[in-house]
């Protein structure tokens, strides 16, 4: 099950089973949506939109599913944020999120899932960049169409979001040159 299509298909099916009627849609963004996915360097970027807050016991089931699927993902893994529909349109910045996951958080979840679920919520300026990519280049994997869920993100929010992501590029380029260089190119391309 290591292909992008198989992983996203399984993710959608299991998300529908766990989130049921609360699920608005699942949206692919990043390199996989823009046709430049590289199994060696890319993660699988997903935005999951729900109608209302997710109870902790459902978050636990959901996270267990994500972690299980993440084992089959490329080495950079799955990165996802779960947001409520009411922060997508009208767009709220910084954007509140219900849940977030990436490989950077895997160890924390595995060591203390209850703490992770309790604390992994808040706001994230980076979501403005993700919403922008979804709006312009994203793919709807299931649920409502992109333009029916997302409002176009204002330029100043997008620029603030990407600035927050690249402001430490001079140092971070040593650790993750591909990511930083591609992010800087994305900034220039958007102008």
Language model segments and positions:
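Helical scaffold of the NTase/Pol beta-like nucleotidyltransferase catalytic core
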Residues: 1-27, 57-58
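Short, structurally constrained coil/turn elements
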Residues: 19-20, 40, 74
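Short, well-ordered alpha-helical packing segments
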Residues: 12, 16, 63-70
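Short helix-capping/linker segments at secondary-structure and domain boundaries
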Residues: 189-191
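A short N-terminal beta->alpha junction/helix N-cap motif
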Residues: 3, 49-53, 184
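Catalytic metal-binding acidic patch
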Residues: 28-64, 77-84
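Active-site oxyanion-binding pockets that recognize sulfate/phosphate
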Residues: 1, 52, 170, 174
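Conserved NTP/Mg2+-binding pocket subregion across the NTase superfamily
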Residues: 67-174, 181, 187
């Amino acid at each position: 099950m290591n292909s992008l299509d198989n992983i996203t298909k399984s993710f959608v099916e299991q998300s529908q089973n766990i989130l049921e009627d609360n699920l608005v849609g699942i949206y692919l963004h990043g390199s996989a949506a823009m046709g430049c996915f590289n199994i060696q360097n890319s993660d699988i970027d997903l935005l999951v939109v729900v109608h209302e807050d997710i109870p902790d016991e459902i978050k636990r089931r959901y996270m267990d599913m994500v972690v299980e699927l993440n084992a089959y993902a490329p080495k950079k893994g799955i990165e996802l944020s779960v947001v409520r529909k009411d922060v997508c349109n009208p767009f709220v910045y910084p954007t509140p999120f219900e849940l977030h996951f990436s490989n950077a958080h895997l160890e924390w979840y595995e060591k203390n899932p209850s703490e992770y679920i309790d604390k992994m919520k808040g706001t994230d300026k980076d979501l403005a960049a993700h919403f922008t990519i979804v709006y312009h280049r994203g793919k709807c994997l299931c649920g409502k169409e992109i333009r029916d869920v997302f409002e176009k993100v204002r330029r100043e929010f997008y620029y603030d979001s990407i600035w927050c992501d690249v402001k430490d590029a001079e140092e971070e380029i040593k650790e993750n040159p591909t990511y930083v260089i591609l992010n800087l190119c994305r900034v220039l391309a958007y102008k």
